Amino acid sequence: GIASISITPDIDTPKVLKSYAKQNEITHRNWHLLTGKPYDVVSQLSNKGFTLYTGKGDATHGGFEHSGLFALVDKEGNIRSRNDAYGNPIKFYRALEEHSFPDQIKELKEDIKILLNE
């Protein structure tokens, strides 16, 4: 499944996330939009669990900053990655917009198929 975790739980209530899902046509039963409090729990999960940056900031919506990256996690809880041309692990994908990073989306789709077949 897919878990999209809000970093602004005071703004992203279940009602707001439901509206967001409808607006963005997120209808698959295995895609979950999650929110929760306190912020520290969400921050710990993101920063230490997935090593994806989140933090409080003044210039961003809701006073929070985030990397915009996301990770694929297998059923054992491990972050899965592929390697670049030099053999270095690429742990994160940059965007969900196909027009912005078409190669990343293609790789993401390939990697999801691999995970689904395990």
Model-derived features: where do they sit?
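Structural microenvironment flanking redox-active thiols in thiol-disulfide oxidoreductases
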Residues: 1-45
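Short, charged low-complexity intrinsically disordered segments located at boundaries
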Residues: 12-16, 47-54, 72-79
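Surface-exposed beta-strand edges and their flanking turn/coil or helix-capping segments
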Residues: 17-18, 46-49, 85, 94-97
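Short, low-complexity, polar/charged sequence segments that are solvent-exposed and flexible
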Residues: 21-25, 52-55, 89-92
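Sec-exported extracytoplasmic/periplasmic mature domains
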Residues: 22-26, 47-51, 78, 113, ...
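Structural micro-motif
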Residues: 29-31, 50-55, 64-71
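Thiol-/selenol-based redox modules, centered on thioredoxin-like
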Residues: 58-118
